[in-house]
Design a protein with these regions (language model features):
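Membrane-embedded alpha-helical bundles of multi-pass transporters/translocases
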Residues: 2-456
């Protein structure tokens, strides 16, 4: 029997465009906040890393809190869309604030400014926006194929935006005056673009009636499914082993991204050409986009996501090992590094495309085992993973830079820093890919759901 389809092509494209807005924040922040703070504002990378780590203490609580709020929201716009719409206004304001730290402030005040703006962006506004955006995958369609297609469109836009931002930002900062003024102007432009695209994405889809989502029109039954407090919500999540696997995988992916963002330092101080960072960004993002184009077809051909995810990430792990080998052979092997970087990205693509559908399957697993609808809360793993993983990754890079005696005033860094940059950019990404591959090999949620449905 063919599954009912709920979406037109323009609904999927409109939804996917929402990650343009998301990556105007995330890609810009993760790729450039450290080099902006160290080389323009003049802050210590170790202290910045510690402040980011401190900020992350709030994130786990706010993720579950906002996820639970979304599950309990009833409005004309639905459960998630209001949070996605209004949350981004705060994202835009705080993004500009982070890249507009006054250079004439005392250093203590600069650290405080950064901590407050960064915490508000991540723990409050980005959390509300991103969880709501991710939860829409399960709220606008019940068709698993459409959920994979939504994820593919979403991440095609995400990686295209990330590629564009990584390629043009440094040049744009210079063209707009350079220094603090250049960074501030670029941040304002990105924030305005994000605000417009996010609004378009919100109104491109419509949530299904709550009764249709739970296959009942009984209002009391729907309300009963939503009766749980914050502690119970946390227990539901922790009790779902597949949620924990996805959450850990998401965190590791974001730490991976933070290490790859060290390409700005690697290109500048090891390869001797900061513009090569943009070239490596192309080698990462173009293969990812190509993989996403074919992900829905491959999922359908292989009758599920499990086998595709494990095989493709195994390829990515092998390729990242070869990137490391090429990198340690010397700077003359940039061509080999680019080739293997592209192959690794191609292997990472399918998981990016079907990840939201896997999360929807995790939510169904909780419904089948606990009889609770926790779609919004379940998608907290996306926001938690992005913020905790990205923040922790950025913090680690700051600590490692400080420990290796990085000095932004030096054109040539000490050998200790050069060695550390190689470890961060070459070795750690390979190790993270290997761990993710192992976790994905245990991610058999589709099989578990089939057994549970058969037992009913």
């Amino acid at each position: 029997m063919t599954e009912k389809r709920y979406l037109k092509w323009y609904n999927k494209v409109g939804y996917g465009s929402g990650d343009i807005a998301g990556n105007v924040v995330y890609a810009f922040l993760s790729s450039f906040v450290m080099i902006y703070l160290t080389n323009t504002v003049g802050l210590n990378p170790g202290i910045v890393g510690t402040l980011i780590a401190f900020s992350k203490l709030l994130d786990g609580v706010t993720d579950i809190f906002f996820g639970s709020l979304i599950d309990k929201t009833h409005s004309k716009m639905g459960k998630a869309r209001p949070w996605m719409l209004y949350g981004y206004i705060g994202c835009a304001i705080t993004l500009v604030a982070i890249f507009a730290i006054p250079t004439n402030l005392g250093q203590f005040a600069q650290y405080a400014w950064f901590l407050i703006a960064y915490t508000l962006l991540n723990a409050v506004f980005y959390t509300a926006n991103n969880i709501a955006y991710s939860a829409l995958t399960a709220l606008v369609t019940k068709n698993s194929a459409e959920q994979v297609e939504m994820g593919s469109w979403r991440f095609m836009f995400a990686f295209a935006t990330s590629l564009l931002i990584q390629s043009i930002t440094l040049g744009a900062v210079t063209a707009l005056g350079g220094g603090a003024a250049g960074w501030r102007t670029v941040a304002i432009i990105y924030a305005i673009i994000g605000l417009l695209v996010n609004t378009l994405s919100v109104f491109s889809v419509k949530e299904l009636p709550e009764g249709e989502l739970v296959d009942t029109t009984d209002k009391k039954e729907i309300e009963q499914d939503e009766k749980y407090n914050l502690v119970q919500a946390a227990k539901l999540l922790v009790g779902n082993k597949y949620y924990m696997m996805i959450c850990i995988t998401y965190i590791l992916q974001q730490i991976y991204g933070a290490m790859i963002s060290m390409g700005t330092y690697y290109a500048t101080y090891i390869l001797g050409n900061q513009n090569l960072f943009g070239v490596f960004s192309w080698a990462v993002n173009i293969p990812l986009i190509l993989a996403l184009v074919f992900t829905p077809t491959l999922v359908a051909k292989w009758s599920g996501m499990y086998k595709l995810n494990v095989m493709s990430y195994t390829l990515a792990t092998v390729a990242r090992a070869l990137v490391a080998v090429a990198g340690y052979m010397g700077s003359g092997n940039v061509t080999l590094m680019l080739l293997f970087t592209a192959i690794a990205a191609l292997g990472q693509g399918p998981w990016q495309g079907d990840m939201n559908a896997v999360i929807a399957a995790c939510s169904e697993y909780t419904w089948l085992t606990k009889h609770k609808r926790v779609d919004g809360t379940m998608y907290s793993c996306t926001s938690l993973g992005v913020k905790l993983g990205g923040g922790l990754g950025t913090a680690i890079t700051g600590w490692l830079l400080a420990a290796s005696h990085f000095d932004s005033a030096l054109a040539v860094q000490p050998e200790s820093c050069i060695s550390m940059l190689k470890i961060m950019y070459l070795v750690i990404p390979f190790a993270l890919d290997a761990i993710i591959t192992f976790i994905l090999s245990r991610m058999k949620v589709e099989e578990a759901n089939e057994k549970l449905r058969a037992a009913v």
